[in-house]
């Protein structure tokens, strides 16, 4: 007598929905206050100038300006938003 189910066991077939993480606004793009820059789990990207971090580690802009990705120490990256009139100079 078999004690294991054969092929096509009902124990298979579950998966979670994709969370749509990643960079949403790239370097050089114009953003406005509240625009989401990066959706992430943990701090792969750290908040820089004029960028805040949400409760789920989402980075978002607090001013209108241009997005820049910058090195932050040896291993880290930060995302900053510089005001458009300052970035134009």
UniProtKB/Swiss-Prot annotation:
Membrane-spanning intervals of the chain: none
Annotated stretches, region: Disordered: 1-24
UniProt KW Ribonucleoprotein keyword: yes
One Pfam family linked to the record: Ribosomal_L27
Any one Gene Ontology BP term: translation
Keyword Translocase among UniProt keywords: no
Database matches in InterPro entries: Ribosomal_bL27, Ribosomal_bL27_CS
Keywords for this protein: Ribonucleoprotein, Ribosomal protein
Annotated Gene Ontology cellular component terms: cytosolic large ribosomal subunit
GO-annotated molecular function: structural constituent of ribosome
Family membership: Belongs to the bacterial ribosomal protein bL27 family.
Alphabetized HAMAP family for the sequence: Ribosomal_bL27
Protein name: Large ribosomal subunit protein bL27
Record organism: Synechococcus sp. (strain JA-2-3B'a(2-13)) (Cyanobacteria bacterium Yellowstone B-Prime)
Biological classification of the source: Bacteria, Bacillati, Cyanobacteriota, Cyanophyceae, Synechococcales
């Amino acid at each position: 007598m078999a004690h294991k189910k054969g092929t096509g066991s009902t124990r298979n077939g579950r998966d979670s929905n994709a969370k749509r993480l990643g960079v949403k606004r790239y370097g050089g793009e114009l953003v406005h206050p509240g625009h989401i820059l990066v959706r992430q789990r943990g701090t792969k990207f750290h908040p820089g100038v004029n960028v805040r971090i949400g409760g789920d580690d989402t980075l978002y802009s607090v001013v209108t300006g241009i997005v820049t990705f910058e090195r932050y120490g040896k291993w880290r990256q930060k995302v900053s938003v510089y005001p458009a009139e300052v970035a134009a100079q």
